[in-house]
Regions:
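Helix-coil modules at protein/domain termini and other flexible surface or pore-lining loops
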Residues: 2-201
């Protein structure tokens, strides 16, 4: 076992010193998908297939981007996926069989400039919103949650563009982003949209 870093949190030092391991993801990637079928379950499976994670046993978790976690591309992340593996992911999903109804699912992400601090992920889903509208909302939610932990004073009623400028000036938040899947429900069945941030250990 390696030397425990002196600046590691006390809880982490205690666990490592006792020979225990904390389940903290080292990497994360974003993915999204959409599926349509006459059966709701099959539409969900097809959405997962479109996202490339249908072979995983997915465990839904919330909503912290771990310290020193690396955000990687989907192509890179898929190299770590193995059929049947227990896969922890922050997921957003919505389903409908109301023909021509617009819907979206989104994961927002806000990462602090100090990599030793944690960031936030938000799950958001909505009807009647475009991909951009849902994505901006999810990103806004994640950034607002992170800002509140960093002591950045913001007006929640400001537009996302105004808040984004405040975050940029504060120099505390290095990156905000989102992954969003929108779709119009197909006639004669169910349509499901899925967005996910998938953790790799």
């Amino acid at each position: 076992m390696g030397v425990v870093p002196g600046n590691a949190p006390v809880a982490l030092q205690n666990h490592l010193s006792n020979g225990q391991q904390l389940l903290v993801p080292k990497k994360m990637f974003f993915t999204k998908g959409v599926g349509s079928h006459k059966h709701e379950l099959r539409s969900f499976e097809l959405a997962l297939r479109d996202a490339g994670i249908e072979k995983c046993n997915i465990v839904h978790v919330s909503s912290i981007f771990p310290p020193n976690c690396e955000l990687i591309s989907k192509n890179e992340g898929m190299k770590y996926i193995y059929p049947g593996m227990i896969t922890f992911a922050v997921t957003a999903r919505t389903t409908s069989n109301e023909a021509r109804r617009l819907m979206a699912a989104s994961i927002g992400c806000a990462i602090p400039s100090d990599s030793n601090k944690y960031g936030y992920l938000s799950e958001y889903y909505a009807f009647g919103q475009t991909e951009k509208e849902a994505g901006d909302t999810a990103e806004d939610l994640a950034a607002a949650m992170l800002a509140s932990t960093l002591g950045i004073d913001i007006d929640e009623d400001k537009s996302w563009d105004e808040k984004e400028e405040i975050f940029r000036i504060s120099d505390e938040i290095v990156k905000t982003t989102n992954v969003t899947q929108s779709a119009m429900v197909e006639k004669g069945g169910y349509t499901t949209v899925v967005a996910a941030g998938v953790f790799i250990f």
